[in-house]
């Protein structure tokens, strides 16, 4: 494993101003955010009029500004796409994150000074995929969230292109941005940030014509949330250039807490200090937002682990197991969880 010459960049999400400011204050090296169009998060983002101020606010604090353009673009939209890209360039953004290789080529044509990053929506899972993105102008590639540490190590050994990986946040049951269930069932395009999240619904299971009793495990397609704090030293040592936190729909508290957690972990790993994770921090991360945190795909693909089936949304912090209910007093007796739970 070979470290890079400088510490990896920490990139935090921003849905709008409160999250952007929280990311800056918590120590992000870069913040990524979208506009109101051509973004995989349709309900949040900045207007074209707000864009210059957002970029300037970040640059005033020596924080990079990355703008997402991470959807596919149709021919009928190319004029609007050109206007948006020109505005991103004029605002002084440090990079634009793209999915569509046609858009990547368009950036090189109309804004050659604007850096292009290949989005995780490209589903790049090999060094050959990295080379393809680089051939279309990508200086950095955000690898698929479905890769293991071993996969990342092999890709890193085969390319010098900057590599970025997600270290925290929601996972897609499909390859990111490739799921068609939302469009097919509800007419809402997941690629355009309108995902209806069919993966978060409760399902019945029929096996050979017979109903299977699922009890409380009916969320058969709902993955847990990624948390790679324990994997930060490995990711630093194998030479990943940027660590990304998912969550443009999350609030400022989430952005502040996750950014602080990974800022501390990256700094400790780079200095080769003890990277023991504070149990109190883990409890805070569970409490701010969690569908069940773990390394999941980074530890290898096992859907029996990634998908627990019990919770489609935020679970909160586990306090223990109910052992007795005192109806007369309106009280519940709870046994705390064991240390290894």
Annotate each language-model stretch with its function.
Residues 127-128:
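Conserved nucleotide-cofactor-binding alpha/beta core module
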Residues 111:
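Conserved phosphotransfer cores of two-component systems
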Residues 1-25, 30-40, 55, 61-68, ...:
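Surface-exposed amphipathic alpha-helical tracts and adjacent flexible/coil segments at the periphery
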Residues 44-52:
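Aromatic- and glycine-enriched glycan-recognition loops and surfaces
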Residues 119-124, 142-144:
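Aromatic/His-enriched, Gly/Pro-containing loop or helix-boundary segments
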Residues 42-45, 70:
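Alpha-helical multi-pass membrane segments and their bilayer interfacial helix-loop junctions
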Residues 102-103:
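Alpha-helix capping/helix-boundary segments
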């Amino acid at each position: 494993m070979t470290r890079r010459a400088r510490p990896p960049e920490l990139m935090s999400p921003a849905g709008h101003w409160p999250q952007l400011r929280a990311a800056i204050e918590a120590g992000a090296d870069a913040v990524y955010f979208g506009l109101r169009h051509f973004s995989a998060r349709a309900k949040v983002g900045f207007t074209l009029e707000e864009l210059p101020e957002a970029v300037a606010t970040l640059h005033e604090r020596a924080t990079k500004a990355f703008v997402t353009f991470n959807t596919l673009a149709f021919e009928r939209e190319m004029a609007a796409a050109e206007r948006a890209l020109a505005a991103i360039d004029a605002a002084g953004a440090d990079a634009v994150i793209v999915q569509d290789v046609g858009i990547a080529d368009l950036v090189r044509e109309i804004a050659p000074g604007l850096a292009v990053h290949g989005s995780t929506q490209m589903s790049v899972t090999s060094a050959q995929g990295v080379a393809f993105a680089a051939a279309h102008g990508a200086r950095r590639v955000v690898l698929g969230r479905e890769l293991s540490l071993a996969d990342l190590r092999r890709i890193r050994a085969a390319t010098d292109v900057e590599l970025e990986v997600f270290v925290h946040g929601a996972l897609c049951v499909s390859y990111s941005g490739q799921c068609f269930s939302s469009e097919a069932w509800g007419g809402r395009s997941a690629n355009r940030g309108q995902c209806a999240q069919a993966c978060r619904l409760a399902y019945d299971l029929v096996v050979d014509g017979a109903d299977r009793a699922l009890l409380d495990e009916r969320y058969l397609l709902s993955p847990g949330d990624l948390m790679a704090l324990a994997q930060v030293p490995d990711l630093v040592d194998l030479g990943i250039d940027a660590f990304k936190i998912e969550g443009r729909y999350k609030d400022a508290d989430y952005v502040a807490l996750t950014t602080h957690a990974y800022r501390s972990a990256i700094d400790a790993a780079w200095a080769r200090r003890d990277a023991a994770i504070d149990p109190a921090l883990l409890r805070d991360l569970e409490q701010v937002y969690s569908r069940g945190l773990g390394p999941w795909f980074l530890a290898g693909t096992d859907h029996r682990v990634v998908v627990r089936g019990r919770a489609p949304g935020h679970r909160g912090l586990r306090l223990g197991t109910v052992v007795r209910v005192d109806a007369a007093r309106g009280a519940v007796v709870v046994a705390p969880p064991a240390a290894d739970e």
